[in-house]
Amino acid sequence: MSAVPELRITLAGTERVVAAGTTAGQALEADGRTVIAALVNGEPRDLTHELADGDVVEEIRIDSEEGRAILRHSCAHVLAQAVQELFPEAKLGIGPPIENGFYYDFDVAEPFTPDDLKRIEKRMQEIIKQGQRFSRRAVTDEDARAELADEPYKLELIELKGGAAEAAEGAGVEVGAGQLTIYDNLHPRTGEVCWKDLCRGPHLPDTRAIPAFKLMRTAAAYWRGSEKNPQLQRIYGTAWETKDALKSYLTMLEEAAKRDHRKLGVELDLFSFPDELGSGLAVFHPKGGVVRKVMEEYSRRRHEEAGYQFVNTPHISKAGLFETSGHLPNYADAMFPPIQFEGADYYLKAMNCPMHNLIYRSRGRSYRELPLRLFEFGTVYRYEKSGVVHGLTRARGFTQDDAHIYCTKEQMPDELDRLLTFVLDLLRDYGLSDFYLELSTRDDSPKFIGEPQEWEEATEILRQAAQKQNLELVMDAGGAAYYGPKISVQAKDAIGRTWQMSTIQVDFQQPKRFELEYQAADGSRQRPVMIHRALFGSIERFFAVLLEHYAGAFPAWLAPVQVVGIPIASEHVPYLEDVARRLREHGVRVEVDASDDRMQKKIRNAQKQKIPFMLLAGDNDVSKGAVSFRYRDGSQNNGVPIDKAIEEILTVIRERRQV
């Protein structure tokens, strides 16, 4: 009797010997519910994947980031199966997992209705309960075309094989550069193919492994993101590892809806988006303008203290500048069309960096001037597609707090350390404190330019700077800008959502393109390194993040109105006007409500406007030179001397405390 062939694998850091034909699931002793897939040599694989000699195997748990992505991708397949069973004429687009959920696009005659979603969700529950198995099989391009002959969008993806991920957002989950694969949903008893889809996987073992899901909404979406293509109907859903996790997520969404900056912007009279201006273009009202002004002034002061020099650049430039910078060859789709003027093409600027390079190049530079830190509140314009424009967080015109630092290679490590500390400290001053860092690097994509060695050096320096902050560091392979690696500061808000805030990017390419030089100590001409940095990302987006973080109740130093005087009767108005005058002398933003409304309504109005302090005054207060001091949360101290009340207000503002 011949011996069973054996394989040597590494499992949880330990070498093991297993029989040939052993699957990842068998090696992991996976239950298919908690451990739902495997990492084999760093690549996610189904539990049914047969192992080879030398494989390194790790578990993927359903409550991990990778595990949730697999869960959501599998749920997208169940969604598509349910739709095609209920709407047989529906043609399939793509259905990837996304942050906190998934979607699938369908070509159907009519948009889906809320009643349709209920029917689809019910059918999904039936499919899940049935326990259909996800089964992977490799197919030739020819066989895939034959099997999917009635799916025109899938056929298009097959023709784009190898470039599908670049051609259509989310298409990378279906078609890669290698052999095509199809996933069948198999009946648990008969093995009959219930449904199939072009897909790279991996997937859950079976549909019963989907613990909790919900369909959320529908939207229109152009195929491959182009308005020249057919408009499809997109169904969004979410899926989680437990029913409690789903409930927590839905509760968070309810709270997020209350904090939606677009809603609060109207309620608090901060900003608006007039139709006459066009999509993605905001106007700030006086109260919003005050908040923005305070944000900018504090940032400006901190930058001046940190050695930055302020500059200003125009909103428009001839095309040649953006050819030199590389933005037209690499970024043209995100720029507005050119304006023809005096025989030349002019573009609204999408980036400030090319103009800062011109400032650097305007005269000879010495090593003694470096690092040179240029800073600007520069307004830029980007052609965001209508489907992704979202209030202030994704606008077409916005102002960046944009800095570009020119330094020597030797100065770069210290400069990045200093810069990252400065960025985090300043964000903390605005009330954000829960951070992690993301390091975006290059991959094998041809979009990345420059020498690999320079990329490696810059990436390692960024990594070391990030590690010194003692924050979690997450790697993002392939997520860098085309010209250099970057660190992104990710911040959690009051309800646990993550926002990308500041970005710090190293750039060896722009100094070459613009032939930037400095005279070194030995008299030679050397090329500086350029560091791009936007601390807020944009003023508008940061405004929106803070508005939602504080649910409109800005800390006193940022509040558009910091104090409101509320007289008990009209004869108390002059007394409060005098208190207001004294506060204004200290720069406090104060109003007196002299309207005919009753006192309780005035208090309610101040609470609705989320004003931090209310000063109430009646006969007793006037006689004692005092006020009733009421906080935003409703707590109140009576008979507070005016001087003490003023000092309390000034202290809270000076210390940037929340009340």
Swiss-Prot record:
Residues 1-61 form the TGS domain. It comes from the Bacteria. The keyword Nucleotide-binding applies. Its main location: cytoplasm. Transmembrane segments: none annotated. Residues 260-555 are annotated as: Catalytic. Zn(2+) binds at residues 353, 404, 532. Its EC number is 6.1.1.3. It is found in: Cytoplasm. Its cofactor is Zn(2+). GO terms for molecular function: ATP binding; metal ion binding; threonine-tRNA ligase activity; tRNA binding. Pfam families: HGTP_anticodon, tRNA-synt_2b, tRNA_SAD. GO terms for biological process: threonyl-tRNA aminoacylation. Catalyzes the attachment of threonine to tRNA(Thr) in a two-step reaction: L-threonine is first activated by ATP to form Thr-AMP and then transferred to the acceptor end of tRNA(Thr). Also edits incorrectly charged L-seryl-tRNA(Thr). Belongs to the class-II aminoacyl-tRNA synthetase family. PANTHER family: THREONINE--TRNA LIGASE, CHLOROPLASTIC_MITOCHONDRIAL 2, THREONINE-TRNA LIGASE. Homodimer. This is Threonine--tRNA ligase.
